[in-house]
Amino acid sequence: MTSRAGIAVAVGSVLLLCGCANVTAVDMDAAQRWVDAAASTAVDDAGFAGSAVLDVGPEDTESSVVRMDFAASVRLSRIETACYGSDREAVTANVSVTLVTSHGEGTPIIREVRCDAEPHSVDVNGLVVDGVVVEAVASTRTYLRAT
């Protein structure tokens, strides 16, 4: 009986480890094509202030945060974020937007967004800002675009 219990524990441990190793992978070549296509699209919105692309993943890195400083103060109504996901499983990103004024950085606005290549708006109430800090982490490595 002891050997059967030992085998059951060993098999259970292997199954548990296999379950933990299952991480959704984003096709980074397809994600790069998506970023390139989005960047090549002309932005003709009169309220457009800028855009940035972040390489995000499960950990904070230098490539998962960007600060956009504007030449002159601008009034922002929203910031749109979009990230590329996976066809097999849902990929999400936690996005933090911090507004920068002449008084310093404000409190971060944090949103969880689905990485479905569609824009998700973060409302900033028409505030006048000198810059924006966007930071994100995602459930797996992907690209996030902020405009």
Per-segment meaning from a language model:
Residues 21, 82-84, 114-116:
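Sequence contexts marking disulfide-bonded cysteines in secreted/extracellular proteins
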Residues 22-71, 108-110:
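Transition segment at domain starts
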Residues 74-81, 120-142, 146-147:
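Noncatalytic modules at the cell exterior or secretory-pathway interfaces
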Residues 88-106, 144-147:
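Short, surface-exposed beta-strand/strand-loop-strand elements in extracellular ectodomains
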